[in-house]
């Protein structure tokens, strides 16, 4: 049984996530009162139940029921009903832009400005974020990107189906990766930006990869980095983590971080892990 609870900030993509899960065969129920979660779980976990994948949507409109939600989650754990919680996050500026584009009002902004409603909701939702097994930052995602992310996380068939590892390159000058569990700064590695014939290329190009890795420092760093990742991943699996985000950052996110991200993703894939690779800023200037 796959039992997924979807929550997060209003405007961060919960509806898109629920639609993506529904397309993948999940039985989806949106805005279920938290007090009914336990009854619903009992029905789903009955031996004769034909439901094997469930997604429940919980949002701020049910904020008065948060106490009931915590009671329900405690009950699920007590009864050994396994569940995952996906939390959708997004930065305030993008949330505000999304609300202006759709001309919809924030559910908490009836008597206040939208930015104030977003701030209040973020504070209310923080305890749920801390309980979540998977946090997805949709700041730089379009709906199709989010759908693809959900599809990769909840697809099956790999050797380690309980953990999805996202390896993401980024540029520090464009902002740090907000949802990363691990962040590695590779700005000390040889920089192809200062080589004229390599500047317009990215870490996906062999010439850039060779330039970055053709130094003793790069080789030694990568061996030690990989050794640490190989040590950490089983610990996260043992802890029950569902989604691990590894961020690799350089200055612009085009050369060094892309190179190291590609190497990490390739190595982890070869070891049978489910890996999602993404280059957040490689096309930015």
Curated annotation (Swiss-Prot):
InterPro entries named among the record's database cross-references: P-loop_NTPase, RapZ-like, RapZ-like_N, RapZ_C
Pfam families assigned to the protein according to its UniProt record, in alphabetical order: PapZ_C, RapZ-like_N
Alphabetical keyword list: ATP-binding, GTP-binding, Nucleotide-binding
Residues where ATP binds: 8-15
Gene Ontology molecular function, alphabetical: ATP binding; GTP binding
Transmembrane segments annotated in the record for this chain: none
Domain of life of the organism encoding this protein: Bacteria
Binding site for GTP: 59-62
Family classification: Belongs to the RapZ-like family.
NCBIfam families, A to Z: PRK05416.1
Stated role: Displays ATPase and GTPase activities.
Stated name of the protein: Nucleotide-binding protein CD630_34000
């Amino acid at each position: 049984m796959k039992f997924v609870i979807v929550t997060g900030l209003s405007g961060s993509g919960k509806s898109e996530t629920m639609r993506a899960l529904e397309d993948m065969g999940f039985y989806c129920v949106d805005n279920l009162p938290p007090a009914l979660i336990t009854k619903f779980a009992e029905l789903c976990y009955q031996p004769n139940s034909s439901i094997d994948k469930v997604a429940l949507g919980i949002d701020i409109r049910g904020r008065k029921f948060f106490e009931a939600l915590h009671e329900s989650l405690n009950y699920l754990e007590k009864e050994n009903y396994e569940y995952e919680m996906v939390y959708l996050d997004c930065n305030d500026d993008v949330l505000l832009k999304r609300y202006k584009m759709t001309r919809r009002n924030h559910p908490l902004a009836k008597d206040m400005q939208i930015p104030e409603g977003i701030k209040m909701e973020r504070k209310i939702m923080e305890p749920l974020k801390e309980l979540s097994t998977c946090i997805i930052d949709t700041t730089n995602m379009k709906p199709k990107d989010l759908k693809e992310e959900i599809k990769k996380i909840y697809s099956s068939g790999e050797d380690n189906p309980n953990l999805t590892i996202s390896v993401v390159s980024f540029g520090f000058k464009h902002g740090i990766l907000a949802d990363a569990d691990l962040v590695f700064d590779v700005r000390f590695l040889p920089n192809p930006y200062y080589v004229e014939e390599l500047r317009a290329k990215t870490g996906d190009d062999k010439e850039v990869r060779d330039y970055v890795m053709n130094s003793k420092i790069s080789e030694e760093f990568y061996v030690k980095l990989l050794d640490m990742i190989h040590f950490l991943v089983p610990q996260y699996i043992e802890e029950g983590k569902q989604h691990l985000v590894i961020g690799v950052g350089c200055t612009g996110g085009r050369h060094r971080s892309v190179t190291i991200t590609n190497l990490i993703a390739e190595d982890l894939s070869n070891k049978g892990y489910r890996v999602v690779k993404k280059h957040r800023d490689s096309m930015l200037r």
